[in-house]
């Protein structure tokens, strides 16, 4: 939980969108639809 918040604050929105696009598919399968 805390890591997610820190990542959102540190990572800019542009990079965050790219990360979600790449990792989002993997994380969705792992955590069942929960984003970064």
Curated annotation (Swiss-Prot):
Localization: Virion; Host cytoplasm
GO CC annotation terms, alphabetical: host cell cytoplasm; viral capsid
Give TM regions.
none
Which keywords, in A-to-Z order, does the entry hold?
Answer: Capsid protein, DNA-binding, Host cytoplasm, Virion
Any one GO molecular-function label of the UniProt entry: DNA binding
**Origin: domain of life:** Viruses
- Function description: Mediates ssDNA packaging into virion, it locates to the internal surface of the capsid. Additionally, plays a role in viral attachment to the host cell.
The UniProt family comment states: Belongs to the microviridae J protein family.
Protein name listed in UniProt: DNA binding protein ORF8
Q: Which organism is it from?
A: Chlamydia phage 1 (Bacteriophage Chp1)
